[in-house]
Amino acid sequence: MIELKEVVKEYRTKNKEVLAVDHVNLSIRAGSIYGVIGFSGAGKSTLIRMFNHLEAPTSGEVIIDGDHIGQLSKNGLRAKRQKVSMIFQHFNLLWSRTVLKNIMFPLEIAGVPRRRAKQKALELVELVGLKGREKAYPSELSGGQKQRVGIARALANDPTVLLCDEATSALDPQTTDEILDLLLKIREQQNLTIILITHEMHVIRRICDEVAVMESGKVIEHGPVTQVFENPQHAVTKRFVKEDLNDDFETSLTELEPLEKDAYIVRLVFAGSTTTEPIVSSLSTAYDIKINILEANIKNTKNGTVGFLVLHIPYISSIDFGKFEKELIERQVKMEVLRHG
């Protein structure tokens, strides 16, 4: 279990004080993948660096497996950092070292005998899919391969927690998915707790169990990914979901002809088993109404599927619309009225 209790990080300059992290409270289950998402300047990079005390909190507590990180001795903190490892956006590899020697580097620092360190590094090379590239230098590798080296190096000391600081933001979409699949595989094999920060909802949706959304140093929304994706509460969260859906329908609404009286345009959100049920056709039959599908989208999260539909109902009485809405609620389908004639 990892806990953040009232964590604050404040930077002081001659002219002003900057509150980078503002009274953050989080609980992260051991063995889970926890995502932190926010736009630039939200405070997420500062936050992740407090898990291993690369940044010391101004106040508050960071507790990992019962250890209060800020209360550890210098030697205790050094030992803890071996178990709370980190990968970076720009890889941070040693360019004068080969793939194998980059992975061996943290083992050398830890005083592991050379033969054992080499054997461990070779195992990690195979784990991350770089067998045959042991003698290559970073300049000879693609971005995805460099990040694989970074991941292998981070695993060298058998950590229990892996911190990912924008680990895929420098990669193309296909390579991003390959790295995310690798992180999932490693989590399953080694029972790691993974904490990642990103500005991409796709990354959160694809591998995370839970997510926290940050803005101006605060956590403004958090919860299971499917729940947050299905029913975002804060404007920032809604923007991330909208971008992931590539949804510009609300902009298109302004170009539509005025609706007739008793006509509606609604958005439905389905989750789980309801995404495969013929709800629209059954409701159309039950209420003897025409329903036009204007837009449809299905997104997979790590723990389930979320579906989105935008519907045009040319005519439905207010009484029937109330019944229509009630039946959707009973079927656990959320509805938002976008326009009403």
Curated annotation (Swiss-Prot):
Give the reactions, separated by semicolons, that this protein catalyses: L-methionine(out) + ATP + H2O = L-methionine(in) + ADP + phosphate + H(+); D-methionine(out) + ATP + H2O = D-methionine(in) + ADP + phosphate + H(+)
Query: What subcellular locations does the record give?
Result: Cell membrane
Tell me the membrane topology, using the record's own terms: Peripheral membrane protein
Q: Which CDD domains match?
A: ABC_MetN_methionine_transporter (cd03258)
Record carries keyword ATP-binding: yes
Pfam families hit by this protein: ABC_tran (PF00005), NIL (PF09383)
Please give the subunit comment from the record.
Answer: The complex is composed of two ATP-binding proteins (MetN), two transmembrane proteins (MetI) and a solute-binding protein (MetQ).
Write down what this protein is called. Methionine import ATP-binding protein MetN 2
Q: Name the encoding gene, please.
A: metN2
